[in-house]
């Protein structure tokens, strides 16, 4: 479903799986802190993050960078960061945490391909993992959580505790006036929270835009 949805497959947004996703987001919108939409922009987003630090919101979707991003922000007494994967939709199902990998490429016409392959293999060595960890980057190596420190131990150990990694993104498409992934899928959630848009209006907009996205895939 994930791959089909992110490639705008015809009819995908009218499936039971898609409806479940829409219903979950709409339900979350019902008890999202009402001040969130006004601060959901590139200038004020840290104020929404501050709601968690102040114990005014119990959770938020975010990334491991949040600790550094809010390092100097005030917080409630005894506050500690926590993290969990997205809960399974059904009991006994899989839970997921979204992630992505940086990529290294070797051009097919490269002169020193063997040396390049050796270097890429080095990127996953114990020594390289130590270097990456000092910069706050984590290599996709089994057991890496055992070598981490501080909050990163908790963040990345969720995969060792059974969470699966969800990877991928919306497929790119040729520019379409007035249509972007963010404005179609994500920004309307602010209107769900404020009550200015219904769940069905959101769905209808996604279906309409996806038809155009699919027709303009790169």
Predicted regions and their residues:
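Glycine-centered hinge/linker elements that transmit conformational signals in sensory
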Residues: 7-40, 86
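Short, hydrophobic alpha-helical packing/hinge segments within bilobed ligand-binding/sensory domains
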Residues: 47-52, 66-69, 116, 129
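Periplasmic solute-binding protein
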Residues: 1-7, 98-107, 159-164, 180-190
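Extracytoplasmic/periplasmic substrate-recognition and gating elements
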Residues: 30-33, 72-138, 187
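Alpha-to-beta junction loops
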Residues: 48, 53-62, 79
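Beta->alpha turn/N-cap motifs
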Residues: 45, 62-70, 102
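Long, aromatic- and glycine/proline-rich binding clefts that accommodate carbohydrate-like moieties
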Residues: 84-85, 134-184, 191, 215-217
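Short helix-initiation/N-cap motifs at beta->coil->alpha
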Residues: 37-53
């Amino acid at each position: 479903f994930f791959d089909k949805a992110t490639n705008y497959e015809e009819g995908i947004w009218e499936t039971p799986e898609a409806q479940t996703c829409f219903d979950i987001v709409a339900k979350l919108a019902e008890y999202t802190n009402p001040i969130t939409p006004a601060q959901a922009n590139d200038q004020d987003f840290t104020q929404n993050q501050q709601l968690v630090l102040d114990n005014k919101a119990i959770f938020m979707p975010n990334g491991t960078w949040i600790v550094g991003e809010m390092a100097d922000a005030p917080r409630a007494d005894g506050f500690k960061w926590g993290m969990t994967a997205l809960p399974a939709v059904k009991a006994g199902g899989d839970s997921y945490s979204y992630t992505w990998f940086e990529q290294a490429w070797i051009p097919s016409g490269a002169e020193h391909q063997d040396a390049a392959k050796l270097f890429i293999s080095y990127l996953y060595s114990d020594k390289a993992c130590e270097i990456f960890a000092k910069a706050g980057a984590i290599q996709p190596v089994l057991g890496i959580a055992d070598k981490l420190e501080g909050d990163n131990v908790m963040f990345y150990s969720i995969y060792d505790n059974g969470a699966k990694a969800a990877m991928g993104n919306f497929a790119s498409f040729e520019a379409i006036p007035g249509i972007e992934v963010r404005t179609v899928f994500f920004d309307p959630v602010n209107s769900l929270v404020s009550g200015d848009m219904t769940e069905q209006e959101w769905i209808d907009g996604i279906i309409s835009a996806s038809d155009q996205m699919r027709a303009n895939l790169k």
